[in-house]
Amino acid sequence: KKYWKDFSGSINISTFRSCKNISGISDPKFIPEEIFFSDIEPTLNNTSSVSFLTYKSFYTKWFSNNCFPSCYFHNVDGEFLDQELNSISFSDVEKIIKELKYPVVFKPNRDTYGGAGVFFPKSQEELLNHLNGRKNFVVQEKIIQHPFFNEFNPVGLNTIRVCLYRSVSDNKIHVLNCTLRMGVGGSLDNVTSGGIACYIDGSGRLNGVSIDKYGKKFQFHPDSGISFSKNIPFFSELIESSINISSQIFYTRLMSLDFSLDINRTWRPIEVNLFDNTIYFAQNAGVPFLGVFTDEVVEYCKKNHWALFLTNRG
């Protein structure tokens, strides 16, 4: 409570208790969730200027990294757009649909929290039916994941969430933590949709235990029986790619990127998350979300709290 007292007169220790009970580790630098979402994140990411980067249709236009999933066509506010974001007619869309290799991925342009709204049409007819009455979406290639990740769960993509921080002291990008997310029983990899998550240490090794949304622990994948004690392949390349992408994001200091390793051993960035960052993957493994940067962030947020700017404007 003492460590976080400057942010609230009454500290809720439920986050601390939960992290301690799950990990067996007690650390005062575990961030209380209500403080993270009301004080820390809004201060570090105190702008709506980059909210357009949460739209998946704009990834390939903004980022120099060309490994994002190929987009076949888009719909933005009811208008159909081609790969280059040029306006096209529905008859053009029908022509594109006839030439696609199925299955494909249909997903909302943004707000896919928990995998909401993501579908995998297996035919022209299924995709056409799914377009009916919908807007603000993108249709992409379906990535074939690397055999290493297929071992854990072959249904959908198993992704690695990489959380990064642009330091307030030197503006350099640092990786905070990484987590492998996997589907279970046919679910997507999102924990809120029934998936599980396994923390990855700084060397790229899984920490041996996966956790579901209820805090239940698994030493082996419930479906495949694969142990969570392996090393992530091409881990250094993952770190390099995540830092490269994050360096192209400005006006925010916290970023979370979701990656999948494809069959060609290439890390494919799937999604960019700038708001509502998930902190419990690391903390449930006994690691404070901000790690060695906790002290500098706390001091920065005390002096530069977003609410102070509102007060000054008034």
Predicted feature residues:
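Conserved N-proximal alpha/beta basic substrate-recognition cap immediately N-terminal to
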Residues: 1-88, 95
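Cytochrome P450 core scaffold surrounding the K-helix E-X-X-R motif
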Residues: 118, 187-189, 279-284
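A long amphipathic alpha-helix within ATP-dependent nucleotide-binding catalytic cores
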Residues: 141-150, 167, 176-262
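Protein kinase-like catalytic core scaffold
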Residues: 104, 174-176, 268-270
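Short, solvent-exposed loop/turn segments at secondary-structure junctions
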Residues: 77-78, 110-113, 144-145, 167-169, ...
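Active-site nucleotide/adenylate-binding loops and adjacent lid/helix of ATP-dependent enzymes
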Residues: 52-160, 165
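C-terminal active-site "lid" helix and adjoining low-complexity regulatory extension at the edge
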Residues: 216-243, 247-252, 261-314
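Short gly/pro-enriched beta-turn/loop segments at secondary-structure junctions
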Residues: 155-159, 168-174, 193
